[in-house]
Amino acid sequence: MLKKSSKKSIKSQEKYMRPPWDAYFMEIMRSVAKRATCDRGRASSVFVKDKQILVTGYVGSPVGMPHCDDVGHQLRKTIHEDGTITEHCVRTVHAEQNAICQAAKRGVPLEGSTVYVNMTPCRTCAMLLINSGIKRVVAANKYHDGAESEMMFKKAGIKLEYLSEDVVKYKKQKG
């Protein structure tokens, strides 16, 4: 015969706390980043609408092309007006761009969605996100060269939220 215990177990006394939606989708974004194939960011994105995932993307080379992790970076130098020289890897497609491509291939509208990203999207990705009709960007960190993107999102009426004020900076980059 089993005896009923009058004492509740410690485990049953601890109340389980479900994560808020933003934390939940950011954790998924971090998992998606594990598929990234360029170590200069390991960026990813998750597009969500009405608490449902629409599409995900991660930084990687175009289909069938070699990956940075396998053959190294394809760096391009830029000489800026102030004389500063920076380098940017051009082998890969950015996470936001890959997700937008996946949405287009599958016929998934992104209008009115929220995108969860590692850092402030670059200028080109910001333009694509604006034209995709997103309403909100949630970024884990700031991008060292993200000021122009921040301004563009503001002008477009897109809400940009940061979970951290930490700034992501790459080697040989301005900012």
Language model features: what each stretch is:
Residues 1-175:
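Zinc-dependent deaminase catalytic domain
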